[in-house]
Amino acid sequence: MHRARWLTPVIPALWEAEAGRSRGQEIETILANKKQSAMPWDQDPEQSTGNYSEDEQNGKQKWREEGEAGRKREREKEEKNEKELQDEQENKRKRENEKQKQYPEKRLVSKSLMHTLWAKFKLNRCPTIQESLSLSFEFDMTHKQISQWFCKTRKKYNKEMSKRKHKKKHMRWRSLCCQGWSRTPALK
């Protein structure tokens, strides 16, 4: 039984066996060991406890315990952060309520007084101090509230006027374009 050279076994004991110098039991054990795998196929070497010393196994247990403790600490931190956020929100609400109690933003004013105030605004958008003091007495408001109302109304009014102005310019330009007018001379 001659095999090609490239098919010859790599184990020296097998070379001797093929050459006719058998050692009996030794070869059978070598072949038996060669056929058996070092570990059964269903056993994962990473999960095997036999490969690790007790110190390594204890280290894994400590690592697992540290992982659980770490998760616990993370949960505690998250709960603490959530609690802090809730406290901040409650404090913010309390501060806003206190501000509203100190300085009520809106007071109910009759429509006729509001029309009067609006008429004063149309006549003079920036009242003098004497005018604003007389208005504050008339409307039973503070000087600060009157000046704030004028400031807010002025902002709204100016914004509305700029929108209208822009619309007028845009509409004027569109109407000119629709009639055939353009800014660039027509090329013929």
From Swiss-Prot:
Gene3D superfamilies, A to Z: Homeodomain-like
GO biological process, any: regulation of transcription by RNA polymerase II
DNA-binding region: 102-161
Biased composition (Basic and acidic residues): 57-106
Keywords assigned: DNA-binding, Homeobox, Nucleus
InterPro entries the UniProt entry points to: HD, Homeodomain-like_sf
Localization, UniProt: Nucleus
Signal peptide boundaries: none
Region (Disordered): 28-106
Superkingdom of the organism of origin: Eukaryota
Protein name: NANOG neighbor homeobox
Gene (UniProt): NANOGNB
